[in-house]
A protein has these predicted regions:
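Cysteine-centered metal-binding/redox modules
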Residues: 1-107
């Protein structure tokens, strides 16, 4: 990642954290229980402008803390790139904090 991209990612991460801290309401439910439900959420995300960060957060169901009975976190998700603090799900492709969560979480 170039220095410019790292700065962009840091700024995006800051904006995301600020939106959630300010009470952004996101769609944490329903959690997709099967591949069809998961694909529907992906379709919603694909329909967005790739730069529509707020709607990515809303549709993705992001929260800035562990979620659910098992306290799931981005850190345990298969899409989380540890060394970049990045969600590698192509429809999201955003920086994330390890302790955050979204409803596209998968192990």
């Amino acid at each position: 990642m170039s220095r410019h991209n790292a700065r962009d990612a840091d700024e995006t991460l800051r904006r995301m954290a600020e939106m959630m801290a300010n009470g952004l309401k996101t769609k944490t439910e329903p959690f997709p229980e099967n591949a069809i439900a998961f694909a529907r959420i992906l379709d919603e995300l694909r329909a967005l402008d790739p730069d529509d960060l707020k709607q990515k957060l809303v549709i993705g169901g992001f929260v800035d803390h562990p979620y659910g009975l098992d306290e799931q976190r981005c850190q345990e998700c298969i899409y989380f790139l540890v060394h970049r603090k990045w969600c590698d799900l192509p429809e999201l492709a955003v920086p994330v904090e390890p302790h955050w969560w979204c409803r596209l979480w998968k192990i």
